[in-house]
Amino acid sequence: MSTIVSVWAREILDSRGNPTVEVEVSLESGHSGRAAVPSGASTGSREALELRDGDKGRYLGKGVEKAVDNVMGEIAENIVGMDALRQVAVDNALIDLDGTDNKDRLGANAMLGVSLATARAAANFIGMPLYQYLGGINSKVLPVPMMNIINGGEHAPNNLDIQEFMIMPVGAPTFSEALRMGAEIFHNLKALLAADGHVTSVGDEGGFAPNLKSHDEAFRYIMRAIETAGYIPGSEVALAIDAAASEFYKDGKYHLKGENKVLSSSEMIDWLMDFTQRYPLISIEDGMAEGDWEGWQEMTVKMGDSVQIVGDDVFVTNPDILAQGIDEGVANSILIKLNQIGTLTETLDTVEMAKGAGYTTVISHRSGETEDHFIADLAVALNAGQIKTGSLCRSDRLAKYNQLLRIEEDLDDEGIYFGPYMASHFGLGEE
């Protein structure tokens, strides 16, 4: 009854108006599952490859008809008849069928759509919420949201080099209260920026994208917004950034155009450390470029005891690369993006490896998103404790937050919000 009987795909649009793949997997029982695949703007060079058509006369070359054809042709031919409850077998069949290291034959976008839709179909067949099907009876931790409220870098047309400035409502007692705090801070920030004559248009992930004098000014605006909303920076709301340093790393140096600085790896680390000493900044993602392995090691040694050092481009959700990082002392946390690796099974393998090594995990969206909220369920399924899914506007971001509200309601008293644990770990609010 849980046998896959059909696999269908279509080309839809993501939050940037670019094509992406949506897949539907149907079972003999009549149950089905649907999944849409996200896409990134700042990408790691070793990510699994999303297949694009390259026809400049159609969607400027970004069409995904080839990936759709692969799903409905070769992939469907090979997985129809398989049991949707055997996720590992389905994903291994996809991997073997593609036969490449970076999934560039069938396309990671084609493969991931099938993988996630299969999991949804299986959950629907059993009659379980997706988070519980994926994680089991102990899935109960509601994640701390990393809310991106000021955008820069590749996500916004402004003069900020750091790609994301985020707030983390660690002092909230529940996820729903954390979401309320974030929304209030977001609206207060908008008012503060507008009062000073700044444009309040938003970037790809829903954060504001003002032209500011410096990165320091961005931090100061956020601190003011937290206080204006009636909260205490540090004990109630911590800060996080995604530097996306690979985007401004050239010839072995970090070129900060907004600051008019060219820094060595050590100088870049010192520049970031200065922010952690003056603001309640507890998490830094991609503070070093993916190719600056020695810089990553130095940063981890200097800051790893007091700051969450998150690897995104450097690890690309790949268990083999993560294993090397663990062995060589690179980072203490990993960002998890499903489409960087291309199947659900490989994603879960990476998370297990990270947790086994004592690394924290942050489940993440991409800058090109859809209304699909799979990652909200995944964050709870894995008890990850943290989720990064954008700002407090744009429905593609809010879809994930709203799903977490539903999950919190479903868990009722059994649900645990991770914020107080993070606050305790980082000593926030201590004298």
From Swiss-Prot:
Alphabetically ordered keywords of this record: Cytoplasm, Glycolysis, Lyase, Magnesium, Metal-binding, Secreted
Cofactor binding, per record: Binds a second Mg(2+) ion via substrate during catalysis.
CDD domains tied to this protein: enolase
SUPFAM superfamilies: Enolase C-terminal domain-like, Enolase N-terminal domain-like
PROSITE patterns attached to this UniProt entry: ENOLASE
First-tier enzyme category under EC: lyase
Pathway: Carbohydrate degradation; glycolysis; pyruvate from D-glyceraldehyde 3-phosphate: step 4/5
HAMAP family: Enolase
Entry similarity comment: Belongs to the enolase family.
Name of the protein described by the UniProt record: Enolase
Chain's gene name: eno
